């Protein structure tokens, strides 16, 4: 049974095997026949489309691949690929989300693409003419499969073989290219299909010139950004510096304004001092008038009384007043023995000062204009900075340097104006001290031109003084003290200034009273300056006469103090000799009165008395006060024996000391000037 079963199985297996072989042989014959038919149809179609290349086997394989691609895209198998079929193929098979660009590249103006159109498009493509090196470069850069480079070079695959890579061909990819990885085969197919249909990829179309231009553009952009950053920082620093300079100009302007206010205040105080001096001189003149009235009263009492003792007492008092007047005259002559500047020189110096002030004001106005220009430039830059591109525009323009230059120029001009103001004040103060009269305070340039008889056309047009002032920050460091010019004079000049400020008929004091004659009024000022007095000799001669009168009586006066010997001791100056003779004559007149009281028997025509009277002018009328009487009245005002006059004199001296003129009877004691501004103590 077993053997039979086995034999049956063997027979059955043999029958089945024979039947299978026969079936497979029939199928292979059919396939071979169909393949042969398809190959024949493909060759015929290829020869119809491109007859010159129909005998090339490689071109036939490429055409067959292109035909397979067209068949893959032609869903309805009508022989043409329309717009919808290509769009669907791009979206589904190639996975393009936005196939608009690819779609327009594939179709162009032809909406239906046939196999012939697709083959002609492939032949006209740049990829068709690629060499082996270009295909290898495409494989490395675009497909990113550099491990198959050697295989491609061995097979010498050029651009003509690109369609065979775009279709699914296991023999080509697996056997020929030896790609075992399925993902690599699929990736190569898709990239090749895209290249065949739409041309070379964009990555392979770049040129090095564009890359170089891109790099250069990036470098230029980075450099421009860095340059803009540097310029922005520089402009900010420059703006800070300019704003600092502008603030310095503001401080300088404020400092100059403060200095000008101090100067105006000093001038006002100086005018106040002058007014006080005028009031003081008026008060002194009133005291002199009271002293004259007192002397006149004493004289009337002496003349009107019949009591000899009263008359002798009054005469002694008058002699004491004469002695005191001579002493005061000595001091006044010593104080007036210095040089006096001519009065015309004061007007010329005042005119010179006003002309210099005009030029200073012109220079100061120019400095103010420069400051205003600098301020306007700074304001413009501030406004530009507030705009969108203001900082960049300011950084690349020359306005910053121009404004900086204007600020520095204005600052230098203000420094020059400050130095000129400082030097001018100091110089005119020294000139006022040396000359002994006022120059800065004057009636004005028009009054001076009229007083000096100058043609006004020579002076030109005057400029008004500006209302405000500017100054550099150097004024903050100015340590000079503004001192009243007349308060800095020497002791001899103070008395001369006081004499000039008084009225002509009262300002000369006892000197004019003692020298009241026609010949004295005709003397020129230069004669008085040239002839120096000798007060010690005059006082010494007068003292001898007075001592002789008071000690030995009238006879010893006639014998010991002869007028001839006294005249020999008088000074050489004619003017001062006249002064001394007038004072001495008055003393002799009083001695004669004593002689008449003490010795009535003495004849009035004594030769000694006549000789003494021959050296003096004729006595004045009783109703008219004589010059000697005026001298006695002037000196009696300063005599402390009158109580109420002494109190007024002390008050006047205190007022005089309060304005800075410290008077002292001793000519050797130094008089200190009044400082209107005191230097502030630095903390």
From Swiss-Prot:
The modification Phosphoserine is found at residues 255, 510, 517, 519, 521-522, 565, 573, 606, 616, 626, 658, 666. Keywords: Calcium, Calcium transport, Cell membrane, Coiled coil, Cytoplasm, Cytoskeleton, Endoplasmic reticulum, Glycoprotein, Ion transport, Membrane, Metal-binding, Microtubule, Phosphoprotein, Sarcoplasmic reticulum, Signal, Transmembrane, Transmembrane helix, Transport. It is found in: Cell membrane; Endoplasmic reticulum membrane; Sarcoplasmic reticulum; Cytoplasm, Cytoskeleton. SMART domains: SAM. Residues 62-95, 100-124 form the EF-hand domain. Residues 668-683 have a biased composition (Basic residues). Residues 488-497 have a biased composition (Low complexity). Glycans are attached at residues 129, 169. CDD domains: SAM_STIM1 (cd09573), SOAR (cd11722). Residues 473-481 are annotated as: Contributes to fast Ca(2+)-dependent inactivation of CRAC channels. PANTHER family: STROMAL INTERACTION MOLECULE 1, STROMAL INTERACTION MOLECULE HOMOLOG. This is Stromal interaction molecule 1. It comes from Bos taurus (Bovine).
């Amino acid at each position: 049974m077993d053997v039979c079963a086995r034999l049956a199985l063997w027979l059955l297996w043999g029958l089945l095997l024979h039947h299978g072989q026969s079936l497979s042989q029939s199928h292979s014959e059919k396939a071979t026949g169909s393949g042969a038919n398809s190959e024949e149809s493909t060759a015929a179609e290829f020869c119809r489309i491109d007859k010159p290349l129909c005998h090339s086997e490689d071109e036939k394989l490429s055409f067959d691949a292109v035909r397979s691609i067209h068949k893959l895209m032609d869903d309805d198998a009508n022989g043409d690929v329309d717009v919808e079929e290509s769009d669907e193929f791009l979206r589904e098979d190639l996975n393009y989300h936005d196939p608009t660009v690819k779609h327009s590249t594939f179709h162009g103006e032809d909406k239906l693409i046939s196999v012939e159109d697709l083959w002609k498009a492939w032949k006209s493509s740049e990829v068709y003419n690629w060499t082996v090196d270009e295909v290898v470069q495409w494989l490395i850069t675009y497909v990113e499969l550099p491990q198959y480079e050697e295989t491609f070079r061995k097979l010498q695959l050029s651009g003509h073989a690109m369609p065979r890579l775009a279709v699914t061909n296991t023999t080509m990819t697996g056997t020929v290219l030896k790609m075992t990885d399925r993902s690599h085969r699929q990736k190569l197919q898709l990239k090749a299909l895209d290249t065949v249909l739409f041309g070379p990829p964009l990555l392979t179309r770049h040129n090095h010139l564009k890359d170089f231009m891109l790099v250069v553009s990036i470098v230029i952009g980075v450099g421009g950004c860095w340059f803009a950053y540097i310029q922005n920082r520089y402009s900010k620093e420059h703006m800070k510096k300019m704003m600092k300079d502008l603030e310095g100009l503001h401080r300088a302007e404020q400092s100059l304004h403060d200095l000008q206010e101090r100067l105006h205040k000093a001038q006002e105080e100086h005018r106040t001092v002058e007014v006080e001096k005028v009031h003081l001189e008026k008060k002194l003149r009133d005291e002199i008038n009271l002293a004259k009235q007192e002397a006149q009263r004493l004289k009337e009492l002496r003349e009107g009384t019949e009591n000899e003792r009263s008359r002798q007492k009054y005469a002694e008092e008058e002699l004491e007043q004469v002695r005191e007047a001579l002493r005061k005259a000595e001091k006044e002559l010593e104080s007036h023995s210095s040089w006096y500047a001519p009065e015309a020189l004061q007007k010329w110096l005042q005119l010179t000062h006003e002309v210099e002030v005009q030029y200073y004001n012109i220079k100061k106005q120019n400095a103010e204009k420069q400051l205003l220009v600098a301020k306007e430039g700074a304001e413009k830059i501030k406004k530009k900075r507030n705009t969108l591109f203001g900082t960049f525009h300011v950084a690349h323009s020359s306005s910053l340097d121009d404004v900086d230059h204007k600020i520095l120029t204005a600052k230098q001009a203000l420094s020059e104006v400050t130095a000129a103001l400082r030097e001018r004040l100091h110089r005119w103060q020294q000139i006022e001290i040396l000359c002994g009269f006022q120059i800065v305070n004057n009636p004005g340039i028009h009054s001076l031109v009229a007083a000096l008889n100058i043609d006004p056309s020579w002076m030109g047009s005057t400029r008004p003084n500006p209302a405000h002032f500017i100054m550099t920050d150097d004024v903050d460091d100015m340590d000079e003290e503004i001192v009243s010019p007349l308060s800095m004079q020497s002791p001899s000049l103070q008395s001369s200034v006081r004499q000039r400020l008084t009225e002509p008929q009262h300002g000369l004091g006892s000197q004019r009273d003692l020298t009241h004659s026609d010949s004295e009024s005709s003397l020129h000022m230069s004669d008085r300056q040239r002839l120096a007095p000798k007060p010690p000799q005059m006082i010494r001669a007068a003292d001898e006469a007075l001592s002789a009168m008071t000690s030995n009586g009238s006879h010893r006066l006639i014998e010991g103090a002869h007028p001839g010997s006294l005249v020999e001791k008088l000074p050489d100056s004619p003017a001062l000799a006249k002064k001394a003779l007038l004072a001495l004559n008055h003393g002799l007149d009083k001695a004669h009165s004593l002689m008449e009281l003490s010795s009535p028997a003495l004849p009035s025509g004594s030769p000694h008395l006549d000789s003494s009277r021959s050296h003096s002018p004729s006595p004045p009328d009783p109703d008219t006060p004589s010059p000697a009487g005026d001298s006695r009245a002037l000196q009696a005002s300063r005599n402390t024996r009158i109580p109420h006059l002494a109190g007024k004199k002390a008050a006047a001296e205190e007022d005089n000391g309060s304005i800075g003129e410290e008077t002292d009877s001793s000519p050797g004691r130094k008089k200190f000037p009044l400082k209107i501004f005191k230097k502030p103590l630095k903390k």
